[in-house]
Regions:
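Short glycine/threonine-rich loop/turn motifs
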Residues: 94, 100, 111-194
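Short, glycine/charged-enriched hinge/interface segments at domain edges or termini
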Residues: 1-116
Length: 195
């Protein structure tokens, strides 16, 4: 029949009596069942990243098993002889590889693990080698540049030589019309325009 709880530090007791040194109020220091959540409450939406708070909540609720998905592992391969990293002063006729840096950063912001980031220039065999290396560890490969119809747009030929299956090549959006999606050895390769 109690309606409150008195903290131990606010009382003294022995075998015969308890002495309380302040006026206790109804509901004081009392946590009703279901205070954190009730039966049937949604603890997390599908797709919520699992962190220490979520694990504590589901443990408190008695949840023993969760269906989870691993973090997506992505590889980024940029193409173009004009690309240069930012570690050296910009050379004439070159540009810094801003697309590669942006893609890697954006993927990490979306909780993906970037397992590989390489620049392959305009070299068909190097691009193919980079894709071969990437599919060993990545769930998704993103490429930039070399996907249109110019002399140095090598990606369509590289994908064909790797016996890739092109799912589409070209979308109705500007910029980015030559975007291509293909499957190579079971790994999706999303090829984006370099511009």
């Amino acid at each position: 029949g109690a309606d409150c709880v008195v903290k131990q530090e606010d009382a003294e007791w022995d075998e015969r009596a308890v002495r309380i040194y302040h006026n206790a109020k109804p509901g004081e220091n009392y946590c009703p069942a279901g205070e954190d959540f009730s039966a049937g409450d949604l603890l997390a939406e599908a797709g919520t990243p699992v962190d220490s708070y979520l694990l504590a909540a589901v443990t408190a609720a008695g949840v023993r098993n969760l269906t989870v998905y691993k973090r997506l592992k992505a590889a980024v391969i940029t193409t173009g002889d004009e690309l240069q990293n930012t570690e050296t002063p910009l050379q004439p006729g070159k540009i810094y590889d801003a697309n590669g840096i942006w893609l890697c950063t954006r993927l990490r912001e979306m909780d993906c693990e970037v397992v590989r980031y390489q620049t392959a220039g305009d070299d068909q065999s190097k691009i193919a080698d980079e894709i071969r290396e990437a599919w060993k560890e990545a769930d998704l490969i993103l490429t930039t540049g070399g996907v249109s119809v110019g002399e140095k747009d090598l990606l369509p030929g590289v994908i064909e030589n790797l016996t890739g299956n092109v799912l589409f090549h070209g979308i109705q959006v500007k910029p980015g019309m030559p975007t291509m999606l293909s499957m190579v050895k079971g790994t999706p390769v999303l090829s984006l325009s370099g511009n």
